Amino acid sequence: MRIAVISDTHDRFPPLLPDRLKGADEIWHLGDVCDPMTLEAFAHLGPPLFVVRGNCDVHPGWPESRALEREGVNFLLTHVPTSRVPPGFAAVLHGHTHVPRDEEINGVRWLNPAASHGRAARARRLRG
C-alpha cells in the first residue's frame, strides 16, 4: 500500500502535487488545510482522503487526531506533535512545524512531511 502524506497546504494546491501523489492508495493530510474548499482538489485525485484539523483550520467535522491501522501497523495522525503517545502506535505523523522529520524515539517513528508548498514542498511515501 502506498500512502501519500501531506501537511500545511494553507489554501494552496501546488501544481506539481498531483504528479507526486500519483499512484497513492490513500492521501493523509495532517492539517492546516485552511479553506475546506481546498480539499475538493485533493478529493478529485481519486484515492481516499483522511484529514485532521490543524491550528489554522476551523472545520468542526475534522478530528484533532486520528488513529489508522494499515497492514498491521498503527498510525497516529495529528497536526501539532503530541508530548505523549498512547500505547500501541508504531508511528506518529504530524505537521505544524513546517520542518521535515523522520526520527525514532522510544520505539515510535515520528514523521513530518513539512509544508506542502514552497521550497519545503514534498510528498513522502510511507511503508509499514
What role is predicted for each listed range?
Residues 11, 97-99, 115-118:
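Short acidic/polar capping segments at secondary-structure boundaries
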